[in-house]
Amino acid sequence: MRRTEQRRAAVWALYQSHLLDRPLGEPLPRDVHGFTFALAEQVLEHQPELDDLIRHYSTDWPLERIAPLERSILRVGLLELLHPEVLPGDDAIPPEGAINEAVETAKRFCGAGAPSFINGILGAVLRARISEA
C-alpha cells in the first residue's frame, strides 16, 4: 500500500473512531501497515496539541463546528508537519508534501470548501513555524 493510501486509511480510522466512539483498534485492526497504525496512534497521542493549533488558526470556526472528517485530515497533516520524528521509517515527508497530501485527501472526500480551508490552516502553521526558526 502506498503512503498516500496509508495516510487516508489513518484518516478514515480516526474519523470512524470518533463517529462510533470506539477505540482506534476497532476501526483499524493492528495487522494493518505499521505506518497507518502508528500515524493514527500518534495523532491521538498528540491530539490536544493538534486541536489547540486548529483552534488558534481557524479563528472563524470553533473546533466543534469543523466536520469530523476535516478535523481528522487536519490532525494527520499537522502531525506529519510538526512531528515527523514520531513516525516509523526514514523517509519523512517534507512539510509542503504533508500539506499537499492533506489537501488532496480533502479534495477527494470532502466538500468544495474543505481543501482551501485545510490548506489555509496548515499553511499558516507552517509559516508560523518557519518564522519562529
Set out the residue ranges of the language-model regions:
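N-terminal interaction/assembly modules
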Residues: 1-115, 119-133
